[in-house]
């Protein structure tokens, strides 16, 4: 598997479209927005998995204790259930490196 360092440059505008079509039904990014089926992603970068206040995570997510940043998100978004066995996230992943890079570029700007 290629790493984030080898990924194409991400486009946040394209990433926003990906978020709206594949992620927004379960996640929010705005500060203070509530949780949906998945946790609010505001403040995602630098946060440990399974630690967002007010959201009930699976044991797998809590125990993985990964710190979310470009490399970990890039690997996770390829196949969430393989990266964190037992995760509640039902999304099958983004197989295309460009889509993952675009989504990460958007998340870096929208969750800060």
From Swiss-Prot:
Localization per Swiss-Prot or TrEMBL: Mitochondrion intermembrane space
Modified residues (N6,N6,N6-trimethyllysine): 81, 95
InterPro entries referenced in this protein's UniProt entry, alphabetically: Cyt_c-like_dom, Cyt_c-like_dom_sf, Cyt_c_1A/1B
GO biological process entries: gibberellic acid homeostasis
Pfam families registered for this protein in UniProt: Cytochrom_C
Molecular function terms from GO: electron transfer activity; heme binding; metal ion binding
Lineage: Eukaryota, Viridiplantae, Streptophyta, Embryophyta, Tracheophyta
Gene: CYTC1
Species name: Helianthus annuus (Common sunflower)
GO CC terms in record: mitochondrial intermembrane space
N-acetylalanine: modified positions: 2
Record PTM text: Binds 1 heme c group covalently per subunit.
Protein name per UniProt: Cytochrome c
Superkingdom of the organism of origin: Eukaryota
Assigned protein family: Belongs to the cytochrome c family.
Keyword Transport found: yes
Function: Electron carrier protein. The oxidized form of the cytochrome c heme group can accept an electron from the heme group of the cytochrome c1 subunit of cytochrome reductase. Cytochrome c then transfers this electron to the cytochrome oxidase complex, the final protein carrier in the mitochondrial electron-transport chain.
Signal peptide location: none
Annotated binding of heme c, by residue: 23, 26-27, 89
């Amino acid at each position: 598997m290629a790493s984030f360092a080898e990924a194409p440059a991400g486009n946040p505008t394209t990433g926003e479209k990906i978020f709206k079509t594949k992620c927004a039904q379960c996640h929010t990014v705005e500060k203070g927005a509530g949780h949906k089926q998945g946790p609010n992603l505001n403040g995602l970068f630098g946060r440990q998995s399974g630690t967002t206040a007010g959201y009930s995570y699976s044991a797998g997510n809590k125990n993985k204790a990964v710190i979310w940043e470009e490399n970990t998100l890039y690997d996770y978004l390829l196949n969430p259930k393989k990266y964190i066995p037992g995760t509640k996230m039902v999304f099958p992943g983004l197989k295309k490196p460009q889509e993952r890079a675009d989504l990460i570029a958007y998340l870096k700007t929208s969750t800060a």
